[in-house]
Amino acid sequence: MRIFVTGGSGYIGRSVIAELKRRGHHVAALVRSDAATATVRGLGAVAVHGSLTSLDVIELATREHDATIHLAGPKSPDDIAADAALLKMMANVAPDDHVFVYTSGAWVYGDRGDAVVDEAAPLKPIALVAWRAAHEEQALALEAKGVRVVV
């Protein structure tokens, strides 16, 4: 498969790229810096220069790949807005049967203490990630457009 990754130079992204390459996939990763370029190239991936706000770059990469794994974690209000714009763009440009992996985290379930929580649990995100629930719903809505979504 041809797979495009955002956040590929990060902690999780590096492991994901390494595993994808080990399994024989072509991988391209969005990068913002020379250091990130060196990191993803060192893993055998193609560097695609841009940021979460570079929707034209992300759109082209989405069209050129079979799957997109969105690992870039928003860290500011501007990043959160860019993440929402990326999801909106995906609804308009992702080819039929495109695979879109949108990563999340346990904090969308809130602080449950020692309780066991699974994916059927209601979302009660902590303030830091309160925006995530709406974004996850937006990602899941891509299924209606023929995109295969994993959150």
Predicted features, each with a name:
Residues I3-H25:
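N-terminal Rossmann NAD(P)H-binding glycine-rich loop of SDR-like oxidoreductase domains
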Residues R23, L43, K145:
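Conserved dinucleotide-binding and phosphotransfer motif residues
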Residues T6, L30, L71, F100-G105:
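SDR active-site strand-loop-helix element
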Residues D34-N92, D96:
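NAD(P)H-binding glycine-rich loop region in Rossmannoid oxidoreductase-like domains
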Residues S15-V16, T39, D79-A81, G110-D114:
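Short glycine-/acidic-enriched loop or helix-start segments at secondary-structure transitions
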Residues L87-Q138, L142, V150:
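Conserved Rossmann-fold NAD(P)-dependent oxidoreductase catalytic core, especially the SDR/UDP-sugar
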